[in-house]
């Protein structure tokens, strides 16, 4: 759900120095999809091992997590569980998009007349994150000594709940739904920052982390969180992907400001009832009362298992052994320093 137009005035760029010593609960699937999309070979295909198994996600997870730790940030990766039934339509839509992209990709390869940029586009659109890839990602993170949380349902909701409980300073995702789930602070671009090529253009831009604070956003807009959720429902969420036809985010904001709720706007005829083909209260409840649990997992950094990391990356997936060993050295050093920064941040709160 895209709230970009509404957050434009209150979002602010962050330096990594401002995040030093802080724990961030990360929507793991969101991060893994970013790695799968960004870490590609020149023809758009993902990195693969000698057996043809995709490794882009492991490459991104290992090296990007080390970079985050080197900035003094402690990541907590939160993985999806079983999605709500109401998400079935959106998941089916995504599946069809991937299948169509795969067909176009194969057709383009056969014809051999399409631009490399088009090949990349179709390759990225056909990205799949399998259960096996997710499990292997958890295994790697645990071997690295990084906190991993298994959500009962939506990882994004659980990451937001960890933030609500005060167990993390912010949640990190590209998706604004984190705000609807009640995250106090949302950081975008945490796992994406650096120079990135614009899609379909030979232009590179500097991507920096940005912070959106829920309370600041709600005060600026003069809304409650429930009303922000209603705007999301009008525009479309994962639980009603089509939203209400003909209404953009600015119109949705105007309507909710005027009537206070989606039901009232329907009752007064501002939004024709015939256009609403979903249960408003049910969808709102999925954001206000998502299936979440207080994590039982240890949320602190622990010692890494170097042999396990080498086994996963080098022995199983053909990563360069020297590079991985160098990464492990960086990892251990960064974790020591990040722990120190976290303790200092805790002390600073008392003075």
UniProtKB/Swiss-Prot annotation:
<dbReference type="GO" id="GO:0003677">
    <property type="term" value="F:DNA binding"/>
</dbReference>
<dbReference type="InterPro" id="IPR006084">
    <property type="entry name" value="XPG/Rad2"/>
</dbReference>
<dbReference type="InterPro" id="IPR019973">
    <property type="entry name" value="Flap_endonuc_arc"/>
</dbReference>
<comment type="function">
    <text>Structure-specific nuclease with 5'-flap endonuclease and 5'-3' exonuclease activities involved in DNA replication and repair. During DNA replication, cleaves the 5'-overhanging flap structure that is generated by displacement synthesis when DNA polymerase encounters the 5'-end of a downstream Okazaki fragment. Binds the unpaired 3'-DNA end and kinks the DNA to facilitate 5' cleavage specificity. Cleaves one nucleotide into the double-stranded DNA from the junction in flap DNA, leaving a nick for ligation. Also involved in the base excision repair (BER) pathway.</text>
</comment>
<dbReference type="GO" id="GO:0008409">
    <property type="term" value="F:5'-3' exonuclease activity"/>
</dbReference>
<dbReference type="GO" id="GO:0006281">
    <property type="term" value="P:DNA repair"/>
</dbReference>
<dbReference type="InterPro" id="IPR019974">
    <property type="entry name" value="XPG_CS"/>
</dbReference>
<feature type="binding site">
    <location>
        <position position="27"/>
    </location>
    <ligand>
        <name>Mg(2+) 1</name>
    </ligand>
</feature>
<feature type="binding site">
    <location>
        <position position="156"/>
    </location>
    <ligand>
        <name>Mg(2+) 1</name>
    </ligand>
</feature>
<dbReference type="Pfam" id="PF00752">
    <property type="entry name" value="XPG_N"/>
</dbReference>
<keyword id="KW-0269">Exonuclease</keyword>
<dbReference type="InterPro" id="IPR023426">
    <property type="entry name" value="Flap_endonuc"/>
</dbReference>
<keyword id="KW-0479">Metal-binding</keyword>
<keyword id="KW-0540">Nuclease</keyword>
<comment type="subunit">
    <text>Interacts with PCNA. PCNA stimulates the nuclease activity without altering cleavage specificity.</text>
</comment>
<feature type="region of interest" description="I-domain">
    <location>
        <begin position="118"/>
        <end position="260"/>
    </location>
</feature>
<keyword id="KW-0227">DNA damage</keyword>
<comment type="similarity">
    <text>Belongs to the XPG/RAD2 endonuclease family. FEN1 subfamily.</text>
</comment>
<feature type="binding site">
    <location>
        <position position="238"/>
    </location>
    <ligand>
        <name>Mg(2+) 2</name>
    </ligand>
</feature>
<keyword id="KW-0460">Magnesium</keyword>
<feature type="region of interest" description="Interaction with PCNA">
    <location>
        <begin position="343"/>
        <end position="351"/>
    </location>
</feature>
<dbReference type="InterPro" id="IPR029060">
    <property type="entry name" value="PIN-like_dom_sf"/>
</dbReference>
<protein>
    <recommendedName>
        <fullName>Flap endonuclease 1</fullName>
        <ecNumber>3.1.-.-</ecNumber>
    </recommendedName>
</protein>
<feature type="binding site">
    <location>
        <position position="175"/>
    </location>
    <ligand>
        <name>Mg(2+) 2</name>
    </ligand>
</feature>
<feature type="region of interest" description="N-domain">
    <location>
        <begin position="1"/>
        <end position="98"/>
    </location>
</feature>
<dbReference type="GO" id="GO:0017108">
    <property type="term" value="F:5'-flap endonuclease activity"/>
</dbReference>
<dbReference type="InterPro" id="IPR006085">
    <property type="entry name" value="XPG_DNA_repair_N"/>
</dbReference>
<keyword id="KW-0378">Hydrolase</keyword>
<keyword id="KW-0235">DNA replication</keyword>
<dbReference type="InterPro" id="IPR008918">
    <property type="entry name" value="HhH2"/>
</dbReference>
<keyword id="KW-0255">Endonuclease</keyword>
<feature type="binding site">
    <location>
        <position position="154"/>
    </location>
    <ligand>
        <name>Mg(2+) 1</name>
    </ligand>
</feature>
<dbReference type="InterPro" id="IPR006086">
    <property type="entry name" value="XPG-I_dom"/>
</dbReference>
<feature type="binding site">
    <location>
        <position position="177"/>
    </location>
    <ligand>
        <name>Mg(2+) 2</name>
    </ligand>
</feature>
<feature type="binding site">
    <location>
        <position position="80"/>
    </location>
    <ligand>
        <name>Mg(2+) 1</name>
    </ligand>
</feature>
<dbReference type="InterPro" id="IPR036279">
    <property type="entry name" value="5-3_exonuclease_C_sf"/>
</dbReference>
<dbReference type="Pfam" id="PF00867">
    <property type="entry name" value="XPG_I"/>
</dbReference>
<keyword id="KW-0234">DNA repair</keyword>
<dbReference type="GO" id="GO:0043137">
    <property type="term" value="P:DNA replication, removal of RNA primer"/>
</dbReference>
<dbReference type="GO" id="GO:0000287">
    <property type="term" value="F:magnesium ion binding"/>
</dbReference>
